[in-house]
């Protein structure tokens, strides 16, 4: 199984959460999205950007296209997701991968495309 890594998992890793680091080590062939890249970089201190880009570049980035944008709009409306979360979900669904997240507020396991690898 391949996975799309949600931003919160990488933030946990960068903050030294061992469960996140262990999960990432076991799933090195996972993907990120342009959403994750932007969210991590916007919150980064200037001195951290190089190491964060190095981490991000270690994953293949799945792109966004019109099919994904259309599905994101549907998911946003149906599940009342924030737009970035709707895009993450749409990218996972279209690419037939699981979205790995710790965000149980917006994503529910029963959505089918979600994997919650650990809890804090």
Give residue ranges: language-model regions.
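Short, well-structured N-terminal submotif of metal-dependent ribonuclease cores
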Residues: 1-32, 41-57
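General small-molecule cofactor/ligand-binding pocket signal
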Residues: 31, 62, 114-117
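Short glycine/serine/threonine/alanine-rich loop segments
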Residues: 77, 81, 97
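Alpha-helix capping/helix-boundary segments
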Residues: 9-10, 36, 68, 87-88, ...
């Amino acid at each position: 199984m391949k996975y799309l890594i949600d931003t919160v998992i990488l933030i946990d890793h960068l903050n030294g959460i061992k469960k996140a680091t262990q999960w990432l080590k076991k799933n090195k062939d996972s993907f990120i999205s342009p959403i994750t890249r932007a969210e991590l970089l916007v919150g980064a201190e200037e001195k951290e950007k190089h190491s964060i880009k190095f981490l991000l570049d270690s994953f293949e980035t799945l792109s966004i296209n019109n099919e994904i944008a259309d599905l994101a709009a549907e998911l946003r409306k149906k599940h009342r997701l924030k737009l970035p979360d709707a895009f993450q979900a749409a990218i996972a669904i279209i690419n037939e991968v699981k979205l790995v997240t710790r965000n149980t507020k917006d994503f529910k396991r029963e959505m089918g495309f979600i994997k919650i690898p650990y809890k804090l």
